Amino acid sequence: MLRVAGRRLFSVSQRSSTATSFVLSRDHTLSDGGNSSSASRSVPSADLSSFNSYHRSVIRGFASQVITQGNEIGFGSEVPATVEAVKTPNSKIVYDDHNHERYPPGDPSKRAFAYFVLSGGRFVYASVLRLLVLKLIVSMSASKDVLALASLEVDLGSIEPGTTVTVKWRGKPVFIRRRTEDDIKLANSVDVGSLRDPQEDSVRVKNPEWLIVVGVCTHLGCIPLPNAGDYGGWFCPCHGSHYDISGRIRKGPAPYNLEVPTYSFLEENKLLIG
C-alpha cells in the first residue's frame, strides 16, 4: 500500500510540474505576441484556475483510489484485515516468516523406526518397573535367618518331672513345665466358671505332661516367677498376680491367662516352638 501511495504522489508531482510549465510557457507566449496588458493578465488567470481544478481532481482521484485499494484488502470492511487476507489471498499480501520457523515434513519411511524405538522404550520401562516391584516384595518378606529364629527346637529329655525350664523365643521367655500326676489332677479339679479367664486345662495343653506358656505377665509385661504364688504355678512380683499350674490367672490384677504359643512335638522328646 505504501508503494502504491508513493507512486501516486510521484505521478501527481510530475503532472503538477507539467501543468505549471505549460501555464508559464503559455503566459510567456502570449506576452511576447504583442497583445495588450489586460489580455496578457487574463490568460494566465484563466489558466491558473484550470490548473487548480485539475490539481483538485487529481488529488480526489488519488484519495478515492487509496480508499478503494484499502477496501480491496479488507481495511474498510467489518471483517479484520487478517481474516480477509486469509479468505481472499492475492499476490499483494506478503507474509513475514522471520518469526515462524517452518520445519519440513517428516520422512514417512522413518516412522517405523520411530515406532520401534518408542515401543522398545516402553517395554524396557515396564521390565525395570517389574524388577523394582519384585525386589520390594522380596525385601519385605522374611529371610531364611529370620525364619530360623522364628522357630525354636527344644530337647525335652533333660527336663525332670515337676521342674520348669525357661527358653528364649522371638525375644520373649517361654516356660516349659513338666507336670507330675498331682499337677495334672490339680489343674483339672478347678471350677472353670469361677475363673476370670475361663479355660479348660485340656484346651491349653496338647500333652497333659507338658505345659508350654509365654513367660510374660498379661498385666504390664513383667516376668512371673515359677513354682511360686498361692496356687503353685507362677507369681508376678510387680503387682502380685497369681497363676495356677495351668498358667491361668487366679488372683491379682492380670486380666488374662498366660499366653500359649504355637508349638508341636516332633518326636517323643523334641519340641518345636513357632
Curated annotation (Swiss-Prot):
Residues 29-48 are annotated as: Disordered. One of its GO terms (molecular function) is ubiquinol-cytochrome-c reductase activity. CDD domains: Rieske_cytochrome_bc1 (cd03470). Its main location: mitochondrion. Binds 1 [2Fe-2S] cluster per subunit. Binds to divalent metal cations. The chain crosses the membrane at residues 112-134. One of its GO terms (cellular component) is mitochondrial membrane. Gene3D superfamilies: Rieske [2Fe-2S] iron-sulphur domain. Keywords: 2Fe-2S, Disulfide bond, Electron transport, Iron, Iron-sulfur, Membrane, Metal-binding, Mitochondrion, Mitochondrion inner membrane, Respiratory chain, Transit peptide, Translocase, Transmembrane, Transmembrane helix, Transport. The keyword Lipid biosynthesis does not apply. Residues 63-111 are mitochondrial matrix. Pfam families: Rieske, UCR_TM. InterPro entries: Rieske_2Fe-2S, Rieske_2Fe-2S_sf, Rieske_Fe-S_prot, Rieske_Fe-S_prot_C, Rieske_TM, Ubiquinol_cyt_c_Rdtase_Fe-S-su. Residues 1-62 form a transit peptide. Residues 203-272 form the Rieske domain. It catalyses: a quinol + 2 Fe(III)-[cytochrome c](out) = a quinone + 2 Fe(II)-[cytochrome c](out) + 2 H(+)(out). The keyword Cell inner membrane does not apply. Residues 135-274 are mitochondrial intermembrane. Disulfide bonds join 222-238. The Rieske protein is a high potential 2Fe-2S protein. PANTHER family: CYTOCHROME B-C1 COMPLEX SUBUNIT RIESKE, MITOCHONDRIAL. This is Cytochrome b-c1 complex subunit Rieske-2, mitochondrial. It comes from Arabidopsis thaliana (Mouse-ear cress). The gene is UCR1-2.
